[in-house]
Amino acid sequence: MPDTPPPTVAGDAPLHPDTQMVGHGHDPFLAQGAVKMPVYHSSTFVFRSAEEGAAFFDVAAGRAPAPAGASGLVYARFNHPNLQLVEARLALLDGAEAAVVTSSGMAAISTALFASLRPGEQIVHSSPLYGGTETLIRQALADWGVGATAFDDGLSAEAMRAALETAAARGRVVLVLDGLNQL
């Protein structure tokens, strides 16, 4: 996706957010003239040479820094044009710098927590939690050296404050979930 911000005006008239969402992130001239983004069914993408492919894989694997403004596609499980478009439009919708789409809520929670926490740190979380999230925190993160402090009453400022004070020295993440599975 281009790094240029989406247009927010047409002439002097501000564009409605719906208009921005419909058109942002797709250049028909880069898609054989298709007015709307085609659905890409390819799982792999071509490089101009084996050397270009090898260099890109080195960047993707973290063995080499990415050149400024460089982007490319390797494998659809990493990224593909449709995913890039959805992420760009979600970022636009939320007024964010970027967005990440995952295949499940647990993938999103796991990615966010492992990216944000380090061994020796603490997570403060609401309780009860969805079972998968509870297992992630109580087992996987605990095995990784991350502690957890829960607060049982998400409506009580005092309960939340007490949990935050308990974890203050090592606290790094506050996780609040609502809408548990229906029993």
Regions found by a protein language model. Name each.
Residues 1-69:
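N-terminal glycine-rich, Lys/His-bearing helix-loop that initiates the first secondary-structure elements
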Residues 44, 49-107, 132-139:
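Conserved N-terminal alpha-helix of the aminotransferase class I/II PLP-enzyme fold
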Residues 75-76, 101-102, 126-127, 149-153, ...:
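Glycine- and other small-residue-rich loops at beta-strand/loop junctions that grip anionic moieties
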Residues 92-93, 111-119:
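Alpha-helix C-terminal capping segments
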Residues 115-132, 152:
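Conserved PLP-anchoring active-site segment centered on the Schiff-base-forming lysine
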Residues 140-155:
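A glycine-rich helix N-cap at a beta->alpha junction
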Residues 153-183:
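Active-site phosphate-binding strand-loop segment of PLP-dependent enzymes
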